[in-house]
Design a protein with these regions (language model features):
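Thiamine diphosphate
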Residues: 1-64
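Short, well-ordered secondary-structure micro-motifs
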Residues: 1, 43-44, 70-73, 107, ...
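Glycine/aspartate-rich loop-and-adjacent alpha/beta segment that forms the canonical ThDP
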Residues: 2, 112-151
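Conserved thiamine diphosphate
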Residues: 73-109
Length: 151
């Protein structure tokens, strides 16, 4: 992550890919990190991403089958076949990472792909102890907006 070029969706769960799409439409390379709980909240944005995202739109799903940041409630996304969903929504590429030994290969292929591209990463439940949320949200927003204007 690059300071000022990354943007945290604090308190806006489900909106990360919509913000990423807006940046991407302006011809910027975008990598959106999303959680399974977040994606469930705005499934319709996946279609908007696939239709409007360009070759530089990359969407990563961190899938632990849990709303980790709000109490570890189950999302039950293990009942969703994301490969079928993503392909039916016309993303150009779908990748899945569920074995660490394949991480370098799959991530390289994902980043080199012409998008919109989607990578589902299967992760285990668990949070970092004492993980804090960013405090100065206005400053983060301003730095992010400034970086969009300069690049």
């Amino acid at each position: 992550l690059k300071k000022g070029k990354d943007f945290y969706m604090v308190g806006g769960m489900g909106h990360a890919s919509s913000v990423a799409l807006g940046v991407n439409i302006a011809k910027k390379k975008v990598i959106c990190l999303d959680g399974d709980g977040s994606i469930l909240m705005h499934l319709g944005s996946l279609l908007a991403n696939s239709i409007n995202g360009n070759n530089n739109f990359k969407h990563i799903l961190l899938n632990n089958n849990s709303h980790e940041s709000v109490g570890s409630f189950k999302t039950n996304v293990n009942n969703i076949n994301f490969k079928l969903l993503i392909k039916s929504l016309k993303y150009k590429n779908y990748f899945k990472l569920n074995k660490i030994e394949k991480a370098d290969f799959i991530i390289k292929k994902f980043l080199q792909s012409k998008g919109p591209s989607f990578l589902e990463v299967i992760i285990s439940e668990g949070t970092i102890k004492n993980l804090s949320r960013p405090k100065d949200l206005k400053s983060i927003k301003n730095k992010f907006m400034k970086s969009l204007k300069t690049n």
